[in-house]
Amino acid sequence: EMITNAESVDNGVEGLLFKTGQTVFAEHLLTSTLPKDVADAHLSGDLHITNLGLWSILPDTIFINVKTLIEDGIDLKGKSLGVCRIPSVKTASELSSALSMIIALISKEASQEVVLDELIPLFSKHSKDLPDLERKLVDSFTTSSTTVGYSKMPTMVSFRIPLGTDQKIVKTVLSAYKTYAKLTPIPKIGLVIDYEKGRVTDVSTILSEIVTIGGKIIFAKHNITQNGMICTKNSTSTVLHLDSLSINLPRLAFESNKDETYFRARLALLMKPALSAMALRNKTISNLIRLGVNPILAANTQYMQRSTVSLVINLVGLQNAVFGILGFQNNKEGQVILHKVIETAVDIASKKGKELGINVIVGMTHSGGAE
């Protein structure tokens, strides 16, 4: 069937192989890996697992220091023997090559997004010839764009750009990214514009041009993904987020016969096994990293000794569930119910996190029917 419908495959033969492999892993996950109640909840629509084929293999989101990755040199140990090793970076040309390789390699080690920090300090050592640096940065972006993703929605690689630091380097990076965005129909590289210590107005003209031509930009006062997932402040280690599980609150509300107490009880009962399944997923992925399946992460985290992992469970359609299906008005009483649901979710996440010995984050996602 896949070969017959090969015209829908976006990345040629590799795309066909990836799709086939993910189909096999997805079936194995649902039939042999996940607890039966969690698998049944996914199949019934009570919860949703994104990227079933990659669930047990890759983390969803990575926050990592690109300066450390490149300055330490690219050494994949005994893995990927056909990939060049760069022991150290001393020139702008070596920096360009190393950056292109890092983008290509690290994008294969997450299913959704990698956020790279410290790009500006990395370039500050090579700021004598800014036009040449810009050309080399464009080369890095364009060369890395040939990397094949695991699906039609490839892993996004974003660079955090802090405003208020080394303005000349910031403008050089923005100019290079603008050129890359012009050349790429759907960019796989994005920018996180951190304006905590700077002013967006200083670079608003070029940023508006980038957005107009389809560049991927998000504004924040901290390190964040393109989807709004926040990294812990002042974290010195690599941070991994496992966040591709969502709970369908409107469906739970529909099955609760307009009883908000029963609704919250069902939410609690669903969250507990879901978080246990995510903890099991964390162990599986951590073991694969220790075995060197993800060589960049293995080297950077010293085989998971220097890393922080968070489980993220997303609640979808809270307002639609409370105001639309349970029948509460969007007033003071309705807001009390809303807060009760959030408190229930946070309480379960906190208790389960302590039990499992891992940080658990509760995220909120609006559904199309939310008011």
List the predicted regions and their residue ranges.
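Conserved catalytic cores of very large enzyme subunits
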Residues: 3-307, 328-331, 335-371
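Conserved phosphate/anionic-ligand binding catalytic regions in large, soluble enzymes, centered on
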Residues: 305-321
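Well-ordered alpha-helical scaffold segments within catalytic/enzyme domains
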Residues: 320-328
